[in-house]
Every structure is written in C-alpha cells, then in structure tokens.
Regions:
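Conserved beta-strand signature within the Rossmann-like core of class I S-adenosyl-L-methionine
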Residues: 143-148, 160, 164-179
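Core SAM-dependent methyltransferase catalytic element
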Residues: 205-237
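Rossmann-like AdoMet
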Residues: 1-127, 135-136, 165
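Short beta-alpha junction loops
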Residues: 104-105, 178-181
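A short, conserved alpha-helix within the catalytic core of class I
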Residues: 123-131, 139-141, 153-163
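Generic beta-sheet signal
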Residues: 73-75, 139-146
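Short alpha-helix
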Residues: 181-201
Length: 237
C-alpha cells in the first residue's frame, strides 16, 4: 500500500511494524531532517489554535490514506477534539459514511448534517461498542476506521480496543493520539498492529520523529490496522 498525500512524491509502502522503536522507515530513508516552522514564543491561545490546526491536518492525512489507498468508506469519529472531521471525510470520499460517537455533553456540538450521532451520555465504552455494533450505523463486515484521537495520558489509556478489534470482521483501522511516551502509546494499540512509523508527533506523522528537526507538540499519534477475519483466516485488507 502507498500513502497518499502524506509524505509526498518520495512516499514508499506503508507497512505494519513491530512494537520496537528499531523498526525500519517505510521510505527506507532516515537521514532527511524536515524543519516545520520557526521557534517562537506563543500565547496559550495561539498555541491551542496551532495544535488544533495540526490535529486537523493529521486527521486529514489519515483520512486521505484510508479513503484513497485502504478503500475505507465508513468512519467513526469517536470524540475527536477538533471540528470538521465529517466534512474532511466527505472531501476525500463523497460517498463515505460518518458516525459521531460523542463524549458526554457534546452530541449537539459535534452533530453534522448527514452524520449520525451516538450519544455517550451515561454509557461506558463496552456499552457504546455494543450499541455501535447493533444499531446498523456501521457494517462491521466491511472495513471501518475509528478515529479516537482525543489525546490520552499514560495513566488513562483507552479501553475497549480488544472488543473493537473483535467487531471488525471486515478489517479496519484505529487512529489514536496521546501525551504518553512512545512505548506506552504504541502498547495502547494492542491488538491492532501499528503502521509505519509506529507513533510520531502529530505535527508530522507519518514521518518518524528522528527525521524532523523540530521540538514538536508533545502529542504523538499513529494508525493501527486490524485484519479481515473469516473462516479461520486473517487477511490484510
């Protein structure tokens, strides 16, 4: 598979990687350093605005890859902390469906024309997954991408990834973001298999951190993959 609009014309194959930080770069090149922006003192408001922009750009790269190269046509916005996810999905693929799983008290805020909203009020992750699996809003016999990019901390990793992985009979993807160290963030994907380069700063993923000469945002992110399940076999899709 080739990443679309993520690394530019020198993009190489995007592959599943091991949990170790020694995994090879998808492009096979680690020498290029990419300065992103000048260092400057910023106000808290300006910094938050910049982080929002970078988060939206990360989601855009993920969505472009999933639509163009992975053939995903179903997206679940699981409490993403920035607006515009449904619109970004439809820009990439006009026929794609989007379901918002809304954190407590945000269903009205996240509601978008043409996108279903599954309210999280009073529901735990397991209950929400059951509702998602039985509501008919998502066909888990086909590939689906879950964007769960509200950054988690080392002490509060996401729950329900095992159950989500089991639901994805037709294969799928999980996007996560975290303020935790790389090793902790990558372990949170289990049993999903992170794609190259594992996790990297949200500002420049899918470039690995060591290829970029910038201090970054302090938020790492990545994309994990679940294989197609069926008849005792597991196939990548």
């Amino acid at each position: 598979m080739i990443v679309t609009n993520a690394r530019g014309p020198e993009t190489g194959p995007l592959t599943a990687v091991s949990r170790g930080r020694e995994s090879a770069s998808a492009t096979g090149h680690r020498s290029r350093l990419v300065p992103l922006r000048p260092c400057a003192e910023e106000s808290p408001h300006a910094l938050q605005t910049e982080h929002t922009r970078l988060h939206q750009a990360f989601l855009g790269r993920v969505i472009d890859y999933l639509c163009a190269d992975a053939g995903v046509r179903q997206f679940v916005d699981w409490g993403c902390p920035v607006p515009g996810t449904a619109e970004r999905v439809r820009d990439a693929c006009s026929g794609a469906s989007v379901v918002h799983v809304a954190p407590h008290g945000t269903a009205g805020v996240l509601s978008t024309a043409g996108a279903a909203v599954l309210s999280g009020e009073g529901s735990g992750v397991d209950a929400l997954l059951r509702r998602l699996g039985t509501s008919g809003l998502v066909d888990f016999d086909e590939p689906v991408a879950v964007l769960m990019t509200r950054p988690f901390t080392a002490g509060d990793p996401p729950t329900g990834t095992d159950a989500l992985h089991a639901l994805m009979r037709g294969g799928g993807y999980l996007a996560l973001a975290s303020t935790a160290p790389h090793a902790v963030a990558e372990r949170a994907f289990l049993p999903f298999q992170p794609l190259e380069p594992g996790v990297a700063d949200i500002a420049w993923w899918p470039y690995p951190d060591e290829d970029v000469s910038d201090k970054g945002t302090g938020i790492v992110a990545g994309l994990g993959r679940a294989p197609v399940q069926g008849r005792g076999t597991r196939r990548w899709r």
